[in-house]
């Protein structure tokens, strides 16, 4: 069995169906004896250029180990599913299990955002405590 990296883009109106699609695709691979090494749902993102007058799409990344038969079935599913607007299958030399750069960058952005918001939350909590202490002193 060979290793593959698969990225597919789903029409934004069909984003609710992504979970079911991924489940069907992973089931087809695993039933044929393959493995899913990495599965990342990148969510809705802006496209570099419009595809069929669509400017956003739901991105999904999969790193799998599967047979040629399972891969052909997966590619047929992509081809005949109107919700999948683009797909790319690349053969890899080995399994990739670590997080993708896209997900790492998103997590670091979220961490920075949380750090920026924390000092404001602490300052508000301190002000609230001071006011309640002064209220208790008046009684």
From Swiss-Prot:
An example Gene Ontology CC term for this record: cytosolic small ribosomal subunit
Role, per record: Binds together with bS18 to 16S ribosomal RNA.
One Pfam family of this chain: Ribosomal_S6
Superkingdom, natural source: Bacteria
Keyword Membrane appears in the UniProt entry: no
InterPro entries from the UniProt entry: Ribosomal_bS6, Ribosomal_bS6_CS, Ribosomal_bS6_sf, Ribosomal_S6_plastid/chlpt, Transl_elong_EF1B/ribsomal_bS6
Similarity comment: Belongs to the bacterial ribosomal protein bS6 family.
GO terms under biological process: translation
Bias type Basic and acidic residues, positions: 95-121
Protein name: Small ribosomal subunit protein bS6
Disulphide bond pairs: none
């Amino acid at each position: 069995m060979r290793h593959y990296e698969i990225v597919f883009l789903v029409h934004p109106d069909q984003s609710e169906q992504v979970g079911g699609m991924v489940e069907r695709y992973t089931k087809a691979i695993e039933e044929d004896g393959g493995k899913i090494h990495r599965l990342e749902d990148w969510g809705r993102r802006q496209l570099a250029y419009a595809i069929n007058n669509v400017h956003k799409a739901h991105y999904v990344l999969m790193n799998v180990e599967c047979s040629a038969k399972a891969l052909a079935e997966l590619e047929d599913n992509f081809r005949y599913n109107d919700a999948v607007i683009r797909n790319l299958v690349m053969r890899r030399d080995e399994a990739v299990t670590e997080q993708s750069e896209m997900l790492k960058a998103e997590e670091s952005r979220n961490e920075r955002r949380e750090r920026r918001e924390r000092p404001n939350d602490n300052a508000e909590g301190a002000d609230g405590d001071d006011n309640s202490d002064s209220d208790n002193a008046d009684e």
